A protein has these predicted regions:
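Non-catalytic cap/lid and distal C-terminal segments of serine-dependent acyl enzymes
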Residues: 1-249
Length: 249
């Protein structure tokens, strides 16, 4: 935040996956960025809502390595329905989550004026990073009170989305959380189209409610595709809802 150097207060923290796409398009995969830093600077300048320290978690550029980092257990990925070539993914998302909460978070809190109050801590991500945000939120409720999952990929095939749903049910609700999840209505992936993505988002919403979560917000964004520009447009509203209870489309 802009006042970090001259203030002595602790700051909100958002831990976000895919750091290379968050702040600068020159480091991004597709020359698109979330503009998270510009948003936080705008909050500082306006002085109405509190900005946050944003901690970006880097990810491998290779898509299969990224799939492994952001999923649980073994599964097979076929890029196109008409190809027989399969990539076996050995997911270690449970280790990713533990590293984030037990190593990165502790380092950040020791090194910076980052709040340790769970009410001031969020985790966020998009696509498979959205899957991981939901997983971290379920598993580490004592440390995280806000979850933001943008266009989360939650398919049972190929990436075993039912494992995430099972974890949400198993974890239940030990602490209240505000959970935001969304999807664009024009999103298409190699292995599925808009309807399948939306159906699985709805399935996770129902699972969250079944588990006992009462502060869940899902959104279907008209015209949005599966990319950083869409997530950049939706991030401000999600952040303000999660931290400040601001209701906006």
């Amino acid at each position: 935040p802009a006042d970090y150097e001259w203030s002595d207060r602790d700051h909100r923290v958002v831990y976000m996956f895919d750091a290379h796409n968050l702040f600068d398009r020159t480091t991004s995969t597709y020359n698109k960025e979330w503009r998270v830093d510009e948003f936080m600077e705008g909050l500082s300048a306006a002085g109405v809502y509190e900005p946050a320290i944003v901690v970006g978690i880097d990810a491998p550029q290779n898509r299969y390595d990224r799939f492994a980092m952001y999923s649980i257990g073994e599964w097979e990925y076929r890029r196109r329905p008409d190809t027989r070539r399969l990539h076996r993914i050995h997911g270690f998302g449970d280790e990713t989550a533990a590293f984030l909460m037990r190593t990165v978070k502790r380092y950040v809190e020791k090194t910076y004026r980052a709040s340790r109050d769970r009410e001031r801590i969020a985790v966020a991500g998009s696509s498979m990073g959205g899957y991981m945000a939901l997983y971290v939120g379920a598993r580490f409720q004592q440390q995280v009170s806000k979850v933001m999952a943008f266009s989360p990929v939650l398919m049972d095939f190929p990436m075993r989305g039912y494992v995430l749903r099972d974890e949400i049910v198993r974890a239940g609700v030990s602490q209240p959380q505000r959970i935001y999840a969304d999807m664009g209505d024009r999103e298409v992936l190699d292995f599925c189209g808009p309807r399948e993505l939306q159906d699985h988002l709805e399935e996770v919403r129902l699972t969250l409610e079944q588990a006992g979560h009462s502060q869940v917000r899902t959104r279907l964004a008209a015209g949005d595709r599966h990319d950083e520009r869409a997530w950049a447009r939706r991030f401000p509203g999600a952040y303000l809802w999660a931290f400040d209870g601001v209701e906006a489309d």
